[in-house]
């Protein structure tokens, strides 16, 4: 603790939870000013904003104590103060009053997503949810959905070259996925047709994971039913469904351009460039979002709490959504600067996740 405390604003041996009301008010004003402007705020401005009459000198003393506690810091370019990541976390956890969506906002989100959900695929509805969320929060919106939970309807093989074919997977909800398959040498078109017929008779209504297990078992039992080349096509098709790390997950991002708004300096531009680079590292984003699938409700990662975006100084607010059986099947949320309007964004993410769950019957 700082040695000066002439008016007793901070109790002796104070931890973060023991800040008294005056200290909390000064700290709250520093954070709220940062969230609104992105700029450091000085003691003179703080003394005008707080409800208790304190001189700028007295405010500076309290700010020095807050700085020693690790809640605020002085950027080298300014005499004012900004909140640290620890300070932002303390603000979000202990001081922030989470707002609520207005009834028109709720109705607008629900009506727009429900209309898309009735007329289009789940993927289209999720994309619309992200577009809406990105527009409301002025941040980038992301969704991670489990492709493994999609139930299959139809498969088709289309030859591209003598040893390459396109595998077209059609899901019951209308999603279509294409994958390029390497064919064994000498496979005739008849083998592609036979393989498609064999698979279509057995995969309908199954998830990718269920279909893989079923077909791997059947291929061992029923080798005599299929010629050798058709067996190879089916085996190659099954292998293509397995994919690599994260291939059973689909990542959708909307609203990159929002991150370019309100840049204050070259440092901000570099931060956004790093964030764009991070968003392109899909494996890392998938890992991050996957951490929220076991959570109940909204999760918030601020700055270096999230290793993926630590260099870009970004925050992530995410929430899981469920299917008709109540199983968590994906995560959605927003990624933006650490000065996100947390009180407004948190209920937006939470409500959007609830509406998506309702659309899926969850």
From Swiss-Prot:
Pfam families: HrcA. InterPro entries: GAF-like_dom_sf (IPR029016), HrcA (IPR002571), HrcA_C (IPR021153), WH-like_DNA-bd_sf (IPR036388), WH_DNA-bd_sf (IPR036390). Disulfide bonds: none annotated. Coiled coil: none annotated. Keywords: Repressor, Stress response, Transcription, Transcription regulation. One of its GO terms (molecular function) is DNA binding. GO terms for biological process: negative regulation of DNA-templated transcription. Negative regulator of class I heat shock genes (grpE-dnaK-dnaJ and groELS operons). Prevents heat-shock induction of these operons. Belongs to the HrcA family. This is Heat-inducible transcription repressor HrcA.
